Each structure stands twice: as structure tokens, then as C-alpha cells.
Amino acid sequence: MLIEDIFKALADTTRLRIARLLGTMELAVGELAQVLGQSQPRVSRHVGILCDAGLAERRREGSWVFLRQSEARGEVIEAIQHLLVTAEAEEPAFAALCEADRRKLAAIRQARE
């Protein structure tokens, strides 16, 4: 995958939020849709772009599709996660989105248990 494809895939706030969430745990598309407050088809489209760029991977379990960070691009993924953590620390608007996402994700994790 070309670096240009990776940057294009990350050139959207929703996809940045998805990448940040996948850095914490594996999630189903429906769970991502809940956290992001967007429709499942819309989230699936964003996930497809991340997968096409090699930044995320799908895993099927029955009728569920789970997503996780790509393991094939370890150093690239690590650098992207570092960049996202730094952006969250320095960009108040992105930090607010990430904090809201974490609160919603915590509720989803609790429901899983």
C-alpha cells in the first residue's frame, strides 16, 4: 500500500476516530456505529476505506464482523496511534470527540460483560 493511500484514508475525522477506537480494542461495525452516532452503512463505508489502505482488518464470527487494527503494518500502525494520541493532547476539538467516544465505548464494554 502506498503512503498516499494511508494519508487519504486518514483525511477524515470519522476515520481518525475509528482508527483511535480500534487502537483500544476490536469492535463490531454496529458497536462503532453506536459510538460514533452514525448509521451502520456509513460506518461500513469508512471502515472499508481503512481496510483498503491496510490500516484495519475484518474478522467474521457468525453473522458479526469485527474490526481491529491491521497487524500487517505494525510500525505504521504504531506511528499512526502515536500521532493520534499527540493530536488528542494538542487539539481540543479532537480531544472532546475522543473523550465522548471513550465514554460510549465504556458503556459498550460494560454491556459485553
What are these regions (language model features)?
Residues 52-61, 68-70:
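Beta-hairpin "wing" of winged helix-turn-helix
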Residues 2, 75-113:
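Amphipathic alpha-helical dimerization/coiled-coil segments
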Residues 43-46, 59, 110:
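Positively charged, low-complexity intrinsically disordered regions
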Residues 34, 45, 51-52:
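Alpha-helical residues within the helix-turn-helix
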